[in-house]
Amino acid sequence: FLSIYSTFIQRAYDQINHDIARMESPVVIGIDRSGLVGEDGPTHHGVFDIGILRPLPNLIIAQPKDAFEAQNILYTAFKLNRPYAIRYPRGSAIYREVEAFEMIETGTWTVLGNLETARVVVVAYGPDVDKIKDKIDANQLPVCVVNARFIKPLDDGLLNYLTQLNKHVIVY
């Protein structure tokens, strides 16, 4: 397991590229402080790691929406025995004990709400998923949220389905 701040990914790029991704080394990379982290200042915003890591071969990139999903993604990452990056934001999370962890199929996204009745679909990942869903529910909006928990690979099946729905799609 390798833990690294998102903002320092650029400094570790060669090692991640050549020694982990291309060699298909079974390393799980925990990317801390992903996203905007105001408390650490503008030099520590974790916004470039996706652009840096996405082109690398053999590397899965995920960002869970909450601690529960993080446990299952971490469990999956260790079971798959291949290069796997898990992004997570600065701060704490609400822990919920589980009896058993579940494998999550790589590249799958989840739909929160009803795609058929929604007039708008919001695609998001990470902790923003629940924040957006809470606002939608509080205001009773005809909007559905897609939890795009895998940044690489994308859920091509769901993406193709969304294009056929003839609805407004917002990628957040």
Please report, for each region that a protein language model flagged, where it lies by residue.
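Conserved thiamine diphosphate
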Residues: 1-118, 130
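Short hydrophobic segments within beta-strands
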Residues: 3, 30, 123-125, 172
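Conserved active-site loop/cleft motifs that coordinate metal ions or position small ligands
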Residues: 87, 171-172
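Histidine- and/or cysteine-centered catalytic micro-motif in compact active-site loops
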Residues: 89-91, 125-127, 148-149
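Generic long, charged, amphipathic alpha-helical segments
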Residues: 114, 129-168
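Extended amphipathic alpha-helical segments enriched in small hydrophobics
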Residues: 119-133
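Structural motif
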Residues: 120-121, 168-170
